[in-house]
Amino acid sequence: MSLSRSEEMHRLTENVYKTIMEQFNPSLRNFIAMGKNYEKALAGVTFAAKGYFDALVKMGELASESQGSKELGDVLFQMAEVHRQIQNQLEEMLKAFHNELLTQLEQKVELDSRYLSAALKKYQTEQRSKGDALDKCQAELKKLRKKSQGSKNPQKYSDKELQYIDAISNKQGELENYVSDGYKTALTEERRRFCFLVEKQCAVAKNSAAYHSKGKELLAQKLPLWQQACADPNKIPDRAAQLMQQMANSNGSILPSALSASKSNLVISDPIPGAKPLPVPPELAPFVGRMSAQENVPVMNGVAGADSEDYNPWADRKAAQPKSLSPPQSQSKLSDSYSNTLPVRKSVTPKNSYATTENKTLPRSSSMAAGLERNGRMRVKAIFSHAAGDNSTLLSFKEGDLITLLVPEARDGWHYGESEKTKMRGWFPFSYTRVLDSDGSDRLHMSLQQGKSSSTGNLLDKDDLALPPPDYGTSSRAFPSQTAGTFKQRPYSVAVPAFSQGLDDYGARSVSRNPFANVHLKPTVTNDRSAPLLS
């Protein structure tokens, strides 16, 4: 190898070391900084995922409390658990990314800057030393030859000249070998650093592959079952169906009629969730359980009995209407008129019905028949104002407004009708209105059936009648004195007098269609929900 070739290789060696120190290490530091940002972002995703799946578990708890969606709650729990395992795998990948890549690279780059500086300095010092030794031998040989040329006996310097030539040849070989080895060492150092980076990145990729493989395995195993669970939203679980069947077959209970309001299968949703029925009053307790499914008929206000799932109360009242009244409107037309305004459907809990003794003793109330117009619908008069607010399914009206009912019976104290003044339709509290007689006068709305009342307590008393304070409402009004005395607040529901009193009145006035038409209420004063004080 010539001297010029050795010098060129020496420059290449120095360039390799300088490239590592001036380009590779700064780029590696930038890579580590970007990796830390990536790690921070993944940590944020992990934290957000925990909150997300905690919320999913909460939704599963809500579903598990429902009789109709219990298995969907189990599915949500499984989803949360599967994704929790996937998230744990992601956290393991994040730990490996931090420990096996970022930490080790950061340690290497700090040590490497000092190591490379020392290695380059050592190489340059050794190369300079060998080069200086070679230059010294060459200078000595040059002096010797100059002496030999001026001497009278040149043969005297020939042996020594040969020794210098051999020494120069050896030192030049050593320098060339050292430069060659130095270049090889520099390339090896550079390659080792890139190999270390690739090796650590492979470890991260391996953990990432394990993460995705684990997620795929868990999801592929569970996903078909989850999709099957939600394939039919209209299917009622067997457990809920058996429960309804047991309640239907048990003594003193009725078949749930929430799925059908008429022969046209008109579905009417519950407008207000959480409304609870009144307990069975003591006067009616002896009659509960003696139900005859063949003779169950509506008692009052169009409320159907136990076997009335396909019963049409409007059609059944044809005999009670005057001959001048036209046939009632078909349920299919009613469905078209207000089906789009009904609230979201909720399942209705089956409620107890009363025995047929009441049905045989007490005929159906004529209050609803009296309130029917010529179009076959019942009319009521508002005794309090009602504001719907932002709820588009509710009906707003003022005191004194007339409302035409569009459905045959109330739902948990709420009725659906159309205001004759504003022509708007919606749900409204039935206790805010009175049924109109055929002559246009209004009468107090009363209901004997416990299952259709919206009151929150047992307001029936053997001897007294009291109206509770309103459950909601800010303004106070005086209740009409001709019916229930003077009150300062709105009633939420209206109770009826003693059942035994109704039997006596009916026995004395068998010609009347309504045994409670002439019942006079005793004025009372009460400040809370306890028993009223007679004035």
Curated annotation (Swiss-Prot):
One of its GO terms (biological process) is cellular response to L-glutamate. Pfam families: IMD, SH3_2. Residues 375-438 form the SH3 domain. Residues 1-250 form the IMD domain. The modification Phosphoserine is found at residues 262, 324, 326, 337, 347, 367, 385, 396, 455. It comes from the Eukaryota. One of its GO terms (cellular component) is postsynapse. Keywords: Cell projection, Coiled coil, Cytoplasm, Cytoskeleton, Membrane, Phosphoprotein, SH3 domain. The keyword Membrane applies. It is a peripheral membrane protein. InterPro entries: AH/BAR_dom_sf, BAIP2_I-BAR_dom, BAIP2_SH3, I-BAR_dom, IRSp53/IRTKS/Pinkbar, SH3-like_dom_sf, SH3_domain. Its main location: cytoplasm. Transmembrane segments: none annotated. CDD domains: I-BAR_IMD_IRSp53, SH3_Irsp53. PANTHER family: BRAIN-SPECIFIC ANGIOGENESIS INHIBITOR 1-ASSOCIATED PROTEIN 2 (PTHR14206:SF3). Homodimer. Interacts with CDC42 and RAC1 that have been activated by GTP binding. Binds TIAM1. Interacts with ATN1, ADGRB1, DIAPH1, EPS8, SHANK1, SHANK2, SHANK3, WASF1 and WASF2. Interacts with ENAH after recruitment of CDC42. This is BAR/IMD domain-containing adapter protein 2. It comes from Rattus norvegicus (Rat). The lineage of its organism: Eukaryota, Metazoa, Chordata, Craniata, Vertebrata.
